[in-house]
Amino acid sequence: MSMQDTVADMLTRVRNAQMAKKQTVSMPSSKLKVAIANVLQQEGYISNVEVAQEEAKATLTLTLKYFEGKPVIETVKRVSRPGLRQYRGKDKIPSVKQGLGIAIVSTSKGIMTDRAARAAGIGGEVIAFVS
């Protein structure tokens, strides 16, 4: 059985690992997952992104962050999904928690935050909300 929505699986693994107070979480790697993980690291939601290559398959390992025993990521929600893609123009990119969270957007210039997409003046597919 093949996995249908790998990004939703990634976000669920991160959410479950943080609820279980794990330090790291591992998953199968892809270019999209690595790009999303790099955005999360740049924004300070996770501490480290590591890709390990074992023969034919690559594994993505994320080091999670906690502040005073609580996970740094409060909520993570998949927005655009395989059954209902969510595309937004440059003027319609949503703001998460009035700017306290981020929206991860897939644009023609790559994966970036909502703020970076607005600054670049480009829209795209809204992948997820993180706060």
UniProtKB/Swiss-Prot annotation:
SUPFAM superfamilies per UniProt: Ribosomal protein S8
InterPro entries hit by this protein: Ribosomal_uS8, Ribosomal_uS8_CS, Ribosomal_uS8_sf
GO biological process, one term: translation
Domain of life: Bacteria
One GO CC term on file: ribonucleoprotein complex
Keywords: Ribonucleoprotein, Ribosomal protein, RNA-binding, rRNA-binding
One of the Pfam families matching this protein, by short name: Ribosomal_S8
An MF annotation (GO) of this entry: structural constituent of ribosome
Task performed by this protein: One of the primary rRNA binding proteins, it binds directly to 16S rRNA central domain where it helps coordinate assembly of the platform of the 30S subunit.
NCBIfam families linked: PRK00136.1 (NF001109)
Family named by the database record: Belongs to the universal ribosomal protein uS8 family.
Assembly and interaction partners: Part of the 30S ribosomal subunit. Contacts proteins S5 and S12.
Protein name: Small ribosomal subunit protein uS8
Organism of origin: Acinetobacter baylyi (strain ATCC 33305 / BD413 / ADP1)
